[in-house]
Amino acid sequence: MKKLLLKCTTAVLCILIVVSFSACGTNETGEENSDSETISVSSNDGEQDTGKRVYFAAPLFSQSEKDYNLKLTKVHEDYGYEVFLPQRDGYLAPELEGKTEEELTQMIFEKDVSEVLNADIIFVVLDGRVPDEGACVELGIAYANNKRCYGIKTDARSVELNLDLNPMISGCFTKVFKDYDGDKLIEALEQYLSENEL
């Protein structure tokens, strides 16, 4: 019961964040507020639009997570996708020196939102007892902006009531690749990419 409550709470929080984000800068009538702060989103001016820009959303807090993220990113790049991997392509340590926690949080948030909006596709690692909260927010932003959404899952811990994922999360995806053997999942992803475009 606690697991189900935690899953529901996580889903509600993700939905609230997405709804709050989509309402930023508007008042109750839907008009833009002149006094609200906005996030500057740069377009890829001058870059050729291939439809193959991927934002890779995943937990990146342990070495094993980072290593697996790099393996999956390499598979995408081997098939011609341009991947933004936050652990690799985000801010460099010197850019973050001397910043307050609030400044760091805002910088990372704005960078990641901008990259999600500039992507054509979001690819989300759904492993963990519950999917990573940041990845769920990024998924919500991508889904709300009509991005193509794909996920992978190798972790069996959250299987409950024959629902592997919360329906509010799984409903966002075009396809979720599942295999509890990470190497077999990579093989399945390679097979899919050799026959299909994301």
Language model features with spans:
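Hydrophobic helical h-region of N-terminal Sec-dependent signal peptides
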Residues: 10-18
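Conserved catalytic or regulatory cores that recognize and/or transform ribose-phosphate-containing ligands
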Residues: 25-198
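Bacterial N-terminal signal peptides that target proteins for export
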Residues: 1-11
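C-terminal motif of bacterial Sec signal peptides marking the signal peptidase cleavage site
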Residues: 20-23
